[in-house]
Amino acid sequence: MKITNPKLIISAVSKKQYPAGNLSEIAFVGRSNVGKSSLINTLIERNGLAHTSGQPGKTQTLNFYNLDEKLFFVDVPGYGYAKVSKAQREQFGSMVEEYLSSRDQLKGVISLIDARHEPTEDDKLMYNWLEYYQVPILIVATKADKVASGKFNAVESQIKKTLKFNSTTSSLILFSAIKKFGAKEIWNWIKGQAELQE
């Protein structure tokens, strides 16, 4: 899907700052430095719109990106970063929970997991939490270019087994920002959830 004019509209920390209107929203969640910003930039074909950082825990707000007045991408603060204080983690946690559990415009969540490693306890908690709230989930296994293509099936199997994957509510796609594979399939899922036309 071609996006011509993506814009960061607001970096929100509470419900009163969320954008008005009824555009569908797709949220991106995952551990710090799992590649959320790289995925967003790849999907919209804009380097640098979503800020990529070598410093984990950099995103500390809900960043709402308006894509041509068609939908919003919402970049959610990364979890699992030890150097963020406990108080900050609790603050982020309540902010994220408020958004993910109560936002009517939210049509699906893309949960990013590093393809090179087994899902962490934080990954499992996030998946179970999204399942509890009955949010449609797309698991994107990032950095798949670092995995031999012959091991893709094994990676998928490990992720599904570890998460106790529910195939009726969830989908799984392997993705590489470097080699650009998986982006078309991710867009197809987004368009289906947000009921978008080309």
UniProtKB/Swiss-Prot annotation:
Give binding positions for Mg(2+).
Answer: S37, T59
Can you give the residue ranges of the EngB-type G domain? 22-196
Q: Which GO terms describe its biological process?
A: division septum assembly
Keyword Protease assigned: no
Q: Name the coenzymes or cofactors required.
A: Mg(2+)
Q: Which domain of life is it from?
A: Bacteria
The residues that the entry says bind GTP are 30-37, 57-61, 75-78, 142-145, 175-177
The record's SUPFAM superfamilies line, in alphabetical order, gives: P-loop containing nucleoside triphosphate hydrolases (SSF52540)
Give a single Pfam family match.
MMR_HSR1
Q: Which PROSITE patterns match?
A: G_ENGB
Could you list this entry's UniProt keywords, alphabetically sorted: Cell cycle, Cell division, GTP-binding, Magnesium, Metal-binding, Nucleotide-binding, Septation
GO CC terms: cytosol
Q: Recall the GO molecular function terms of this protein's record.
A: GTP binding; metal ion binding
* HAMAP family linked to this entry: GTPase_EngB (MF_00321)
* Family of this protein: Belongs to the TRAFAC class TrmE-Era-EngA-EngB-Septin-like GTPase superfamily. EngB GTPase family.
Function as written in the Swiss-Prot or TrEMBL entry: Necessary for normal cell division and for the maintenance of normal septation.
Protein name as annotated: Probable GTP-binding protein EngB
